[in-house]
Amino acid sequence: DGAPFWEGEDLKGRRLLLFSEQGFGDTLQFVRYAPLLQARGAEVILHCQQALVRLLATAPGISAAIPRNDPPPPHDLRAALLELPRLMETSLDSIPFADGYLPRPAVVAPPADRRLRVGIVWAGSPSHKNDSRRSCKLTEMFCLFDIPGVDLFSLQFGKAAGALGSAEQVLVRNAVSGCTDFLDTAKVVCNLDLVITVDTSVAHLAGALGIRVWVMLPHAPDWRWMLERNDSPWYRTMRLYRQANPAEGWEPVIQQIRHDLSGLADSHNAAVR
């Protein structure tokens, strides 16, 4: 690609190609800048992973989303998504659209008098360099399975989804078996009250949609989650649950989640009675 990199110059009347270099979560997190670039006069083209194309083709500020395995259309300038916080001079106090920025797909609303609907993800991609620290086992989440007033739904993809055997499926329904891309997954997530997940792309998807999400973080988390805080300036609907001591594993984190989930279920079920 011979187009020059954008370095903050005037964008009026220019076609800007945003390209993703990293994982799904990074693309979802930083596509939030597209409306700001459009407001500066750019036509914004997104070159991203195939699984995100249908979801992000309708994202605010995006004129077109192109699979990154396909050649991009002609463009005047280009920028990596992960460079946008720097290029837009973002500070912790100026992170845009923390309330959510992706349009929610149309879904059939569940009954108003239902139990609390909670999606869970226990493992990320095994190819991720930090996967052994950021993922847990489904068995470690078993203490969440018997909370009164809660219906659990698996949002787990990949090999780890095989842990959901016939016995577990009595208590946890597989909600993503028919999903082919992130738009399908977004439709599932938008039918939930809460997502509980390790540090995966589903955490970013829920936050970008403005859905309540609780994220389990290892003792040494990825840079974006910072340290010593239980909220995220990137997503206002997100709560962070951190490992205090890696030697203790995930049990203290999940026990805290069980306590908080029990309280949330009590409040929810009292409200819908």
In which residue ranges do the predicted regions lie?
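Catalytic machinery of carbohydrate-active enzymes
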Residues: 1-273
